[in-house]
Amino acid sequence: MKKDILNKYNINNQEIEIKSDLASEFPVYIYLSEKKDYLLYSTSIKQLLDSEEVNKPLKTTIEGISFLLQSGVVPLPNTVYQNIFIVSIGNTAKVKTVNNKIEIEFSYHFPFMNKDRDDEADIDEKFILETLAEATISRLEKDRDSYLFHSAGKDSNSIALALAEAGYQNQVTCISHQSKGDKDESEISQKIAKQLGFKHQKLYDPKELNEKYLYSINTFFENAPFPSMDGVTLAYPLYATQINFDGTNLIDGMGNDTFIGHIPSKLEFERQRKLSRYHNLRPFVDKLDSYGRVKVATNTRSEWTGLFGISYRDTSKILKNSYNAYSYWKNIDVERNNFDYLDFRASLRGTLIDQEIFTRKIRNFADITNSNLILPWTNQKVAQYFSKLPERYLFDRKELKNKLILRKILKNKIGLDSDKLGKMAYSFDFYAILMMMKDYVDNQILFCKLWNNIEIKKLLNSFYHKIDSNHRLSWRYKTLVQRLYLISVWYNTNKYVNN
């Protein structure tokens, strides 16, 4: 399939099979007409949704909204929309005509099982850097400014090193977010960028919200093809007020954990091992304690990979005819019962959370700014190479340590000691931003037509009460306030839903 071409399947056409590339550098988006008499598909969601053959306004599904509330993501191939699907890592869609109607048969096969690695394969550090550079440079569009989202992490620094060794320092600017506190990566990023010969620019949190930022927020949600529940979603409208990203090349380091080893923390690994057997108690616990430790102790194995949200008890109060996401994740646990946890985590977090929460936010941003998004780690050649390497080069099961070869390369080449530095996760104070525009946030939530207006007010106030009382889980309640806002503001203002 050619990239960004809008394809059409009509009734009685020959059966076709739709797949994405191996690591979903280019997911395929499908629209099935309401009468099931034609089907459109493309690697460009913007091209698909902007087509005159797609009936608008688009209709959302109660099931999709239910998943966003409870889990933060809609399981693929489904989306929050009726009749729009995503074919991503491991998905296949067979399209055929049956009784004068178009039918889609979806199937799933995870392509990155660790048992399929080649134990005899050897590592080639030069090939790794050259392939990463090629995956980036081949996608750069000339006469566009180019930006690399850069941090102190292994993924973006591997790309930066590869580009530097290929002589592309003068064509790319490294950008990093200056976070508050001891998790700020921008100083390290700036130092490495200078060492490698790149220009560097810091992105800052606002001290107050001005009209420019509010306009950028409105523009973002009005034009975002999909909702994204990522905690740093609001950072992107902020970035757009500091750099003009319109029509640029955007390079990001996401997308490699699925095939390079999706390694959990030791705490997560132990909790899923010991506690996931108790998930059958969930229906009872949900009636008593929707957000406390007892609720967490009844997580399914799927949910231990990073899925959490508003309880079904509260979801059913604010959303009429809501769907209980727990039943779906319970079935996934059964279907993948023979996966060890590293394969299981890669098959679920890697293909769903990483794709449709983390990467989706920057895909949205690229579509909104008409930018050329480049995800070098998802390149077919890169993914094929790493997916066949022996585990010993990539991760340590006993120590739960990831990306061993990248740690080695970066330490030897640029002196970046990831072991000494430790985990420095990207930090963005989304709740401070929400509180700067609290009246606006509350109005978007309280007057959203998705919700029961009496119950949503009770729920929102209960979250604020827990936050203001410094509840031990106040960080989680802040996340849930943000989730209500992200869904509500998208539903209220999005041009595809409100056309």
Predicted segment positions?
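Short, solvent-exposed loop/turn segments at secondary-structure junctions
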Residues: 22-26, 45-48, 154-156, 181-182, ...
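Short secondary-structure boundary/capping segments
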Residues: 166, 217-221, 261-274, 499
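Active-site adenylate/phosphate-handling loop in enzymes that bind or generate adenylated species
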Residues: 237-317, 361-382
